[in-house]
Amino acid sequence: MNVCLRFRILLFFAVFSSALFAQNRQKSPVAEMRGAWIATVGNIDWPSKPGLSPDQQKMEFDSILDVLKAMNMNAVFVQIRPAGDAMYKSPIVPWSKYLTGKQGLAPADSLYDPMEYMIKAAHTRRMEFHAWLNPYRASFDLDTASLAPTNPLRSLPNNRKSEWFYRYGNRYYFNPASALVRQYLINVVKDIVIRYDIDGIHFDDYYYPYKETGQNLDDYNAFARDPRHFTNIEDWRRDNINLLIQDVSQTIKKLKPYVRFGVGPFGVYRNKDQDQNNGSDTRAGIVCYDDLYADILLWLKNGWIDYVAPQIYWSVGFPPADYEKLVDWWGKHTYGRHLYIGHAAYKIGNSTIDPNWNSPEEIKRQIAVDRANPNVQGSIFFSARPLLRNPLGVQDTLINVLYKSQTVVPGLSFMTKVAPLTPQICGVKGSKSAVKLAWNICNILSGEEMPYYYAIYRFEGESVGDFKDPSRLIYLSPYHDEKLIFEDQTTIEGQYYTYVVTGFNRVNVESYSSDPVFVKKTKNGAKKKRKFWGYLF
């Protein structure tokens, strides 16, 4: 009888043993989002300047990832649509000037697709790649002559431009009220999801523009022409954004259900003096709902987004917008979706307004607040470049204190109906320097899926220990792993060890655990002692 078949037959014994191991079957604490935004607009993070060769761009991106990986980060959110343009090879959107120096100008190497390279580079390091789009920003200035001829801001006839675009301040924006614009943006997202192996689509905080003194939105005629059922223009504006968010969500789920859709909004939804029921105890001058017309809570309630990553760019105790109060508020309004907190890495050691940011303890306080809230699944830092500069030794703080152990991205169980197939350890081989483990997958049953990657937990002694101890996670395999072999080179002669393997799917939901394997490290190798059948993780 092979190991997989025997595992299936003996699964019912797990019910009997489940109480014994109940504490070990809880959600692993090694699950935590640890991400960084990589901004391309204005060449904030990457590439360092326009016009670099493809090899130079690759080298710079690899360098960023290597530093982030050393800090045990597990995801990057890369801005691939900074201002109506593309940091990738698109049949719809012109090449970005931040890449080549001129909008519409392709890289010198015709085979080079920056996003394709970045995805592979991230996945090779076992980091998720989320494609970050600014949906509505059409230009970063008023110089339309410098735009690519294929840019609709140039190519459309003047009588249609007024439907597609509006000017606000010194920039042009896509008009959220236009059904044609909405379909255009959906097509952009659809193209990315179909052609690229991304883990998520990410929108930032820009919907309607941040308000400027003396500026008014010029959309009253559009509202008069097509108010739909609205009598209030502000409700109408919010609904314009709602329609895009809903349509993008549905488009993604139809194409690739595992691709996550999330947003990184401004950190305050509404102040309490604006909304006693849904407002936070803050005095923010700008808020999502009333100024940017982004009804984040509606998107969460309706399940249109899979996570929210509010930009809480203030310190713990900052009077107008206290970090701790805002984390608590967002934690009470997740509606079953994931919550990742956006941290202002750019303020670390660099604030003339709030002295808290000039203390190396501030980021420790913020992460402590996050981890004390059961509804917070992790953090995203804005942005990568400040982390690389290491202000106040933040890299060292992350590596040696806060992010000392590796983690997986928390599983989004609401995005899948089944767990991935359960792996089983099928071979143990020892040498003087290592214990080698091999595992395989049981017979595939209807509706089950192969793991996307694997984790190995190791416990000292001859029993399964605490899965909540992050030091027990000793190995995470590459994505799309087919090798199914691991060498543990940190064993000690004469010591007994217990190994367990689990698998994860594309939304990081973990499988049942394998049966534990008990091994004694000997002078010349390792000796497998016995198995406990039917243990469920």
Where are these regions (language model features)?
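Active-site-adjacent "subsite" loops/lids of carbohydrate-active enzymes
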Residues: A31, A39, N43-M59, A131, ...
